[in-house]
Amino acid sequence: MKVTLFVTCLVDMFETNVGKATVEVLERLGCEIEFPEAQVCCGQPAYNSGHVEAAKEAMKHMIETFEDAEYIVTPSGSCATMFHEYPHVFKDDPKWAKRAQKVADKTYEFTQFIVDVLNVTDVGASLPGIATIHKSCHMTRMLGVTEAPGILLSNVKGLTVRELPNVQNCCGFGGTFSVKMTPISEQMVDEKVDSAMETGADYLIGADCGCLLNIGGRIERLGKEIKVMHIAEVLNSRS
């Protein structure tokens, strides 16, 4: 099975280890990974900031880059969601809307692909300790992926998963929201950190690097002792 990887901007620039873990997990599951070097940003930051035409140019480039893929997989629920929004963005342009739909139909978030397409619930990972899961807004509310991360983590040897209080609450990242509305964002992430600490977990695990960079940065500034990990890193663990 050929999988074309959309690595995302944040993974490419800040969390390359997440990209490596994503590839290694998928390869162990029998996937052949392709990486188009022409890939750029999915256009979400520009689109959400109101720069629609600039966003469309990036989106068109991404459609051209990925439309011939068999499966498109990304370690980000937020970026996967943006791919699924492409048909809506181009709804008044039938030519591009059709091409956008073709891309959207074969785009999956990393854990969604493992559980729903590969039909795998245990990847053979092991990580001793206690974890709690942060569920990102776009991934759960828009993409509809709510169960796959928990299913996979429940089968990680040695790992106990505890429910995160107020798990439905946003972490305060929201892309440019955290920059434009910093005081509100800080209050939101403080509440998220407090909830994570309440669980007594060793690890806070999520599927979006934006959320994890935001939460992890706040944890570090506050001097809290809980390790933030992307789920790809956890599933690639052999502790």
UniProtKB/Swiss-Prot annotation:
Q: Which GO terms describe its cellular component?
A: cytosol
Q: Which GO terms describe its biological process?
A: lactate metabolic process
Recorded hits in InterPro entries, A to Z, give: Cys_rich_dom, LutA
- UniProt GO MF annotations: oxidoreductase activity
State what this protein does. Is involved in L-lactate degradation and allows cells to grow with lactate as the sole carbon source.
To which protein family does this belong?
Answer: Belongs to the LutA/YkgE family.
Q: What is this protein called?
A: Lactate utilization protein A 1
